[in-house]
Curated annotation (Swiss-Prot):
Topological category with respect to the lipid bilayer: Multi-pass membrane protein
Coiled-coil regions listed in the entry: none
Keywords: Amino-acid transport, Glycoprotein, Golgi apparatus, Membrane, Transmembrane, Transmembrane helix, Transport
Native species: Schizosaccharomyces pombe (strain 972 / ATCC 24843)
Gene Ontology molecular function terms on file: amino acid transmembrane transporter activity; gamma-aminobutyric acid transmembrane transporter activity
The protein's name in its UniProt record: Uncharacterized amino-acid permease C15C4.04c
Lineage: Eukaryota, Fungi, Dikarya, Ascomycota, Taphrinomycotina
Glycan attachment positions: 6, 394
UniProt-listed InterPro entries: AA/rel_permease1 (IPR002293), AA_permease (IPR004756), Amino_acid_permease_CS (IPR004840)
Location(s) in or outside the cell: Golgi apparatus; Membrane
Length: 542
């Protein structure tokens, strides 16, 4: 067994000097049980040690479960169902079809760039951790701080918006069962949303073994539902729309001019569906051969989502009829649920709306699982108020249960904005896309700018010669769409339909900066090493 070289260590295996240990971290190789107070089980844990972290999770996610997790985070079938109103309002059927194709290409560039970095740094910190090696030392703490808070906000907004959609779909199914006699209200949606988030918190309080079992069969189930739904729509549709109507007949009802500009708001559906690319990274410490399996899962899952999502949008466009107003203003609150009702009747629409609800439940579970790991990893680096509490691992389940329930409380609070108006909740969808994508492209941009100078070493999964081109397009695309996602999607603008994404973003970032300047900057040094820090043992109880 190799020993620790070039690092000053005392008899108890503690670094004599924090800065010396940090600067010599890359010299840390395989560490034996006799040299530290924890056991190294395999090469995966040795790699984690080289990155500076104690292995504390069990690696119980199989190859299929890892792919299924990555695929579930998009919730393709259900997320298209719940966000189809955006392209319909911005440009009708052509917006749904072409926005998916165009925006999906940009999203794929982000996903592949993220997968590349996940391979190089397979830790629960995700892209936040990469700042340690991709940003010059002087700027690293503040850049890592901003990236971490953006990722945390984006993950929370992802859970909130997913579970809001979950509540909408469940109540839409109830409405269909009453032949539209029952119409959901804001208060009903908020109440069901809170119950759904609590349920997802309970599921995520289970052990990793149970989470693996729950996740494992999801991908097969999801793909079967998607294919069967498309077949049923095509088989039962009494009259298809023309190719001209589907691909070229742009009809904008957003109030924005020119129509070409209005068309761009359809990108939000794609950006919300194809995001949270690094969710798989947040369970990297629970995956065997994570440096290969995690990026493979991200790339494959997003590629399938991109292709099948485009096909599904085309099928919906051909079968939805031509009365856009009735779809957009449907009492069900979901245009696709109305399409199901029109084409498949009461029983068929109930079946696929309920299946959408089940699928997006899985998305909510995996999104919360990823966000809990984000909170845990960020707390490990002492970047949150009261980090010592959120960093605890439950000894029975070996999962961050306290972080899960912090997530539950925050996400419910975030969704209370929906009590004001249904339109106001749009801000949470926008925040999810903007915050997450910027938490990705900042490290990607740093890799482009500083990677060569800082001797960046790619992982076993990388893009080779195409890396710089894909990375650059990902950065440019994110900068472009972020401007669109901060704007109101309809005009004239009123307090009810205003896009409050900028308020949510500014509020959370302002809090993080105040916390930074009020004292965190003195103690926060960026992603920390903890290979020998007994005081940060996540299994210790208070």
């Amino acid at each position: 067994m190799d020993s620790v070289s070039n690092v000053s260590v005392n008899e108890q295996g503690k670094f004599n000097d924090k800065e010396e240990g940090f600067s010599n971290l890359k010299s840390l190789k395989h560490v034996s049980h006799s040299e530290t107070d924890f056991e190294v089980s395999n090469d995966e844990d040795n790699q984690l040690l080289e990155l500076g972290y104690k292995p504390v999770f069990k690696r119980e996610f199989s190859t299929w479960a890892t792919f299924s997790f990555a695929f579930s985070i998009s919730g393709l079938f259900a997320t298209v169902v719940t966000t189809y109103s955006y392209p319909l309002i911005s440009g009708g059927a052509p917006s749904a079809v072409w926005c998916w194709l165009i925006a999906g290409a940009g999203c794929m560039c982000i996903a592949l760039s993220v997968a590349e970095l996940v391979s190089a740094y397979p830790t629960s910190g995700g892209l936040y951790f990469t700042c340690k090696d991709l940003v010059p030392a002087r700027s690293m703490p503040v850049v890592a701080w901003v990236v971490g808070w953006l990722n945390l906000l984006g993950q929370a907004a992802g859970v909130s918006s997913t579970d809001w959609s979950c509540a909408q779909l469940l109540l839409a199914a109830v409405s269909i069962s009453t032949d539209l006699k029952y119409i959901p209200t804001n208060q009903h949606i908020v109440g069901v949303m809170a119950a759904v988030i609590v349920f997802h918190g309970l599921v995520n309080s289970l052990s990793t073994r149970w989470l693996d079992r729950i996740t494992r069969f999801y991908a097969t189930f999801h793909l079967i539902v998607l294919v069967v739904c498309m077949i049923c729509l095509l088989a039962k549709c009494p009259k298809f729309n023309t190719g001209k109507y589907v691909f070229t007949d742009v009809q904008a009802s957003s109030g924005w001019h020119p129509i070409g500009f209005s068309f761009l708001f359809g990108f939000l559906s794609v950006a919300w569906c194809m995001t949270d690319y690094d969710a798989t990274a947040h369970i990297a410490e629970e995956i065997e051969n994570a440096a290969v399996r995690a990026p493979n899962a991200i790339a494959l899952a997003l590629s399938i989502t991109y292709v099948l999502g485009w096909v599904f949008n085309i099928v919906l466009a051909f079968t939805m009829g031509t009365d856009l107003d009735s779809l957009i203003n449907s009492e069900l609150g979901q245009p696709v649920a109305q399409i199901f009702y029109n084409v498949l009747g009461k029983k068929g629409s109930m079946a696929f709306t309920i299946l959408s609800f089940i699928i997006i439940n899985f998305t909510g579970i995996t999104a919360m699982q990823a966000n809990a790991r984000t909170i845990w990893a960020f707390s490990r680096d002492q970047a949150l108020p009261f980090s010592r509490y959120w960093y605890k691992i439950n000894k029975t389940t070996t999962t961050p249960v306290i972080a899960v329930w912090l997530n539950v409380v925050f996400c419910i609070a975030l969704n209370l904005i929906g009590l004001g108006s249904i339109e106001a909740i749009e801000a949470i969808f926008s925040v999810c896309a903007i915050a997450l994508d910027w938490s990705y492209v900042i490290p990607i941009a740093c890799k482009l700018i500083f990677g060569k100078r800082l001797n960046y070493k790619p992982g076993p999964w990388n893009l080779g010669w195409a890396s710089h081109f894909v990375n650059a397009y990902a950065v440019c695309w994110t900068a472009f769409v972020s401007v669109i996602f901060l704007m109101p999607t309809v005009r004239p603008v009123t307090p009810q339909n205003m896009n409050y994404a900028v308020v949510v973003l500014a509020g959370v970032l302002l809090f993080s900066l105040v916390y930074w300047w009020s004292g965190a900057r003195k103690s926060y040094i960026g992603p920390r090493i903890n290979v020998d820090m007994e005081s940060e043992d996540p299994f210790k109880t208070e």
